[in-house]
């Protein structure tokens, strides 16, 4: 994928980004053979899906971003490749958390923090400015399990599919941006 062709990425260090993607793909291939971390076929499409939110939302004022159910790193790892914000990834699966820790070391990501625990069991040291999650669960249960990390200023950015409209019933303050079948939901 040629990232330099996208206007919304023009202000980022794309050479460094592409080097980190190469490391990511090599590590994912290695870990996937043993641990079966993901069944995704087109990694490039999923990387683009992870960073497309930068076309719709400005992350510059956020100090701490929490990603819930980080799995193989989509979307938070790729945002951390591009941004300087602190990313806190919550992944209770030991194999996936080990992959994320290895990736952090290999890519020298000082802005990435991995927690091998469920977010609802986390005893808060910080409040997240932004909480992200990609297709983990319905919106209302997600809001509930994140109560230790959020305050009245926390913004949720969710990568969802077409079901998002039903999930948002009785929720008022949100925006949805679309890219193909993906719905990027921003809850304020």
UniProtKB/Swiss-Prot annotation:
Gene3D superfamilies, alphabetized: Vaccinia Virus protein VP39
Name used for this protein in its record: Ribosomal RNA small subunit methyltransferase G
Its EC number(s): 2.1.1.170
InterPro entries: rRNA_ssu_MeTfrase_G (IPR003682), SAM-dependent_MTases_sf (IPR029063)
Keyword field contains Coiled coil: no
Similarity comment: family membership: Belongs to the methyltransferase superfamily. RNA methyltransferase RsmG family.
GO CC entries: cytosol
Keywords assigned: Cytoplasm, Methyltransferase, rRNA processing, S-adenosyl-L-methionine, Transferase
Alphabetized GO MF terms: rRNA (guanine-N7-)-methyltransferase activity
Group of enzyme by EC: transferase
Binding residue positions for S-adenosyl-L-methionine: 69, 74, 119-120, 134
Function: Specifically methylates the N7 position of guanine in position 527 of 16S rRNA.
Catalytic activity reported: guanosine(527) in 16S rRNA + S-adenosyl-L-methionine = N(7)-methylguanosine(527) in 16S rRNA + S-adenosyl-L-homocysteine
Localization per record: Cytoplasm
Gene: rsmG
Pfam families: GidB
HAMAP family: 16SrRNA_methyltr_G
Superkingdom of the source species: Bacteria
